[in-house]
């Protein structure tokens, strides 16, 4: 029996206990998870009657009151980068209809060196703009509002001393059959530990590409990019 902590980004840090053996694909052993327990929030303010820990004051500190999906990757040492998708500022209200509030950003970036997750994930810092608010890293709807809806990170990885994040640039969320449409997908890179980012325009995937969304993996000195279509 082992215990591990995982993150459900934008919502809670969870603790999992159980038989967590994972073998090769042709093995009969599988990953088994039980006893899932919510520990803390990662971003945002507590809800009325909320008893979860909330170690990060992301609302007043960074104007991050609500976030979309999140992803994390190992940078160096104990340092982890965390990209969040669509992010709302002051005035955000939790509801089933999506984002609201002020200061919409398509994505924001946080950093953590916390290795003890039993009391929640603590954010050390976020990438900030001149006003001290979490900065939109990958250009979203505000740069081309007639065409761009938003730019959502799908996966990130460090290669040598370069950090890379794959994004999908959304054209329409309301396509038929629950799908969404992209203008393109691309990669942004940073060579200064996440302080500045630039888009690699030569790495661009078309709207019908099977690399509209990806997951990165490392093995034997190679980096693999596993892709799928948008929506």
Which ranges hold each PLM region?
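Bacterial Sec-dependent N-terminal signal peptides
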Residues: 1-27
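N-terminal regions that are enriched for targeting/export leaders
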Residues: 26-169, 181
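Repeated scaffold domains used in trafficking and secretory/extracellular systems
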Residues: 154, 207-215
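Short, solvent-exposed loop/turn segments at conserved positions within beta-propeller repeat blades
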Residues: 176-183
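Asp-box/BNR beta-propeller loop motif
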Residues: 190-198
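Short loop/turn motifs that cap or connect beta-strands within the blades
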Residues: 202-205
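Active-site cradle of extracellular carbohydrate-active enzymes
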Residues: 217-231
């Amino acid at each position: 029996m082992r215990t591990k902590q995982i993150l459900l980004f934008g919502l809670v840090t969870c603790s999992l206990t159980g038989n967590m053996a994972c073998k090769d694909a042709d093995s009969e052993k599988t990953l088994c998870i039980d006893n899932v327990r919510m520990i803390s929030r990662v971003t945002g303010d507590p809800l009325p009657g909320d008893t979860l820990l909330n170690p990060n004051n992301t609302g007043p500190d960074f104007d991050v009151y609500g976030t979309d999906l999140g992803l994390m990757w190992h940078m160096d040492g104990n340092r982890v980068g965390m990209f969040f998708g669509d992010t709302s500022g002051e005035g955000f209200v939790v509801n089933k209809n999506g984002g609201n509030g002020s200061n919409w950003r398509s994505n924001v970036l946080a950093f953590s060196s916390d290795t003890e997750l039993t009391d929640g994930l603590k954010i050390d810092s976020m990438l900030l703009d001149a006003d001290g608010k979490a900065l939109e890293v990958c250009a979203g709807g505000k740069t081309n509002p007639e065409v761009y809806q938003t730019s959502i990170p799908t996966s990130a990885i460090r290669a040598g001393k370069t950090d890379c994040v794959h994004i999908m640039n959304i054209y329409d969320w309301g396509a038929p059959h629950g799908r969404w449409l992209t203008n393109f997908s691309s990669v942004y890179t940073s060579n200064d530990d996440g302080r500045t980012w630039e888009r690699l325009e030569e790495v661009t995937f078309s709207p019908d590409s099977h690399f509209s969304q990806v997951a990165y993996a490392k093995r034997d000195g190679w980096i693999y990019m596993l892709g799928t279509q948008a929506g």
